[in-house]
Amino acid sequence: MSTQSPQAPALSLDLKGLLCPMPVVKIAQAIKKVNIGDLVEATATDPGVLADIPAWARTSGHEVVVLERQDNLIHFVVRRLK
C-alpha cells in the first residue's frame, strides 16, 4: 500500500459561468502550460463539460482523473499525457 499523498494539481482554473466551447478551449490552453504527467483541475458550471471534457481528453490523448458534479458545480481533473 502506498503512503504517498495524492498528486497536487499544477494548475487550477475557475471556469464558472463559461459556456461551450470555452471550458474546453481554456483547459486545452492550460494543459500546454504544465509538464507531462502533471494535473490541471477546474471547476465549471456548464453541464456540457460532463460530455465535452472526456471527449476532448480522448481525442487529445490526455486522461480525465476526476469528473464529478455536486449541485450546479462540476469539478474535473485532467492529467497531461503527451
Residue ranges of predicted features:
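Right-handed parallel beta-helix/beta-solenoid
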Residues: 5-14
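Amphipathic, hydrophobic secondary-structure cores in small proteins
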Residues: 15-68
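Core SAM-dependent methyltransferase catalytic element
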Residues: 75-82
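SAM-dependent methyltransferases
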Residues: 1-2
